[in-house]
Amino acid sequence: MASISKKIDENITQIETIFGNWSDIVERRFDLDRCAWGDDPAIYVVYIDGLCDHELIENTLIKPITWEWRNKDTADLWEHIISCEGQTADYTQESDMDNVVRAVLRGDTAIFVSGSDQAIVVSSKHFPVRGIEESS
C-alpha cells in the first residue's frame, strides 16, 4: 500500500513513475494564488484521455476549482473542492495511491491538493455511444 504524501511534488513523481510515458495520460497542474503552501502547485489533476468525459472534467471539476476559488472567502482549498464536487459529481476521498491509480485506469479523475494526504477521485467515466446494428 503506497500512501499519498502531503507534498504534491512527491505525488506527481509517483504518478509519473507509475504511468511513465503513456501518451494517453493527461496531467494538469494549477497554482492558485490564494494558497499559502509555498512553491508547489496547489492542485494536480490526472486522468486518461479517451476514458473520461472531457466536458465533465472541464465544466464540473477544473472550472469551479480554479475560477470560483478566487471569489471564495474560505481559506481551506480542500474544503472548497469537496463542496464543489459534492454539488456536481460522484466522488470519493482516497488515502492509498494504489487505489487512486486503479481508479484512474478505470476512467476516473484524480485530484491531488497540496497539504493533503488524500486524493479526491471523481467518477468521470465516458463510454462511447454505439449505434444500433442491423441483425444479419
Stretch-by-stretch model annotation:
Residues 1-136:
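Membrane-embedded alpha-helical signal segments
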